[in-house]
Amino acid sequence: MAIHLTEAAQQALIGDNASKGLRDYIGATPKLRFYTGAQNANEESLPAGTLISTHTLAAFGAVSGGTITSVNATADAVTAAGGTIACWVLLKADNSTKILDGSAAKTSGGDIILDENVVVGAGATVKMGNLALNMLHGNE
């Protein structure tokens, strides 16, 4: 039998106006990094692949329907090592405290879907749009 999270608990976990939650834990200017290689099996560790790009995100806004969204992220130049983007990590503003990670793909099958090619050359620009995080509740 599955564990079900109530909507009120979902809102509190992600950070509604009454509780700090994940939104406050993430902070004002979190970093999103894209890497080559697979997502690390250890949720506490960074990927073993090569760092492709680092993006500074805007603070996540107020929760709406269990979702918080960061809009107007910066676009950063790719590091000297190009490659195939395959995973990502979200870090606090200190650029070292890991919050979560996932896989990346071009069309489907990834936790983040890229609009452009997953293969990028050295010195290319990887553009970042909005990032939404959703905390599911009930049977979602």
Task: Give the ranges of each region predicted by the language model.
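Small cysteine-rich, disulfide-bonded extracellular modules of the LU/uPAR three-finger superfamily
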Residues: 1-88, 92-140
